[in-house]
A protein has these predicted regions:
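Conserved alpha/beta cores of soluble small-molecule-handling proteins
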Residues: 1-167, 171-174
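Short beta-strand/strand-turn micro-motif
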Residues: 176-179
Length: 192
């Protein structure tokens, strides 16, 4: 087979796999992933990648719905089943499927697990590479409404756990915004 995919108990080709519209990864980027290359149908550093995957999930309160050894066996099996000996193996866990809402309680309670393997090759080690440099501003773009809202999900959950409605975010002494609301400050109030 050319490629193979798994999503919450269903196995098919990547092209035939369907994901629900209310999967939290599409709303919020609410999940973690790891990826590894395979050479001769063997994933490189599989255990290291899977340990990091489980550790990442734990840090954002996602319980991966498959034990480590079972997931390891699935990845190995998928790598053997595809035609190409050189491939990319990918694993992803999300908070699951549920109606859109920042707090975890909207997630429906069951995390989702994705696995896929498709043909890919490592770039030759002796190849020349070109690069540019840019300042790392990945987390300074709260003015851009992307769907990568994992920090907002975490902040909203922490507010709920504290019995609060919202988390006000700041950089030093400057308020930037809230986890899922705008921040407005009235500094000069007058009674007329």
């Amino acid at each position: 087979m050319e490629n193979i995919a798994y999503y919450n108990g269903k196995i098919s080709s990547i092209e035939e796999m369907t994901i629900p519209m209310n999967e939290r990864s599409s709303y919020f980027g609410d999940g973690v992933y790891d990826a590894m290359f395979t050479v001769d149908h063997v994933p490189l550093q599989l255990d290291d990648h899977l340990r990091r995957f489980y550790r990442s999930a734990k840090k954002i309160d996602i319980d991966i719905p498959m034990p480590f050894e079972e997931l390891r066996a699935m990845v190995l099996d998928f790598c053997r089943r595809i035609d190409s000996p050189d491939a990319m193996a990918y694993v992803q866990a999300t908070r699951g499927v549920g109606m859109r809402g920042h707090a975890y309680r909207f997630a429906g309670g069951t995390p989702s697990l994705w696995v896929w393997v498709k043909p890919d090759m490592l770039d030759p080690m002796d190849r020349s590479y070109k690069a540019i440099t840019m300042e790392d501003t990945r987390y300074f773009h709260c003015d851009i409404k992307t769907i990568n809202l994992l920090p907002a999900v975490i902040y909203t959950q922490r507010a709920e756990e504290a019995g609060c409605d919202e988390t006000i975010l700041h950089r030093g002494d400057r308020v930037t915004e809230c986890a899922h609301s705008n921040a407005v400050s009235y500094t000069h109030l007058r009674a007329h």
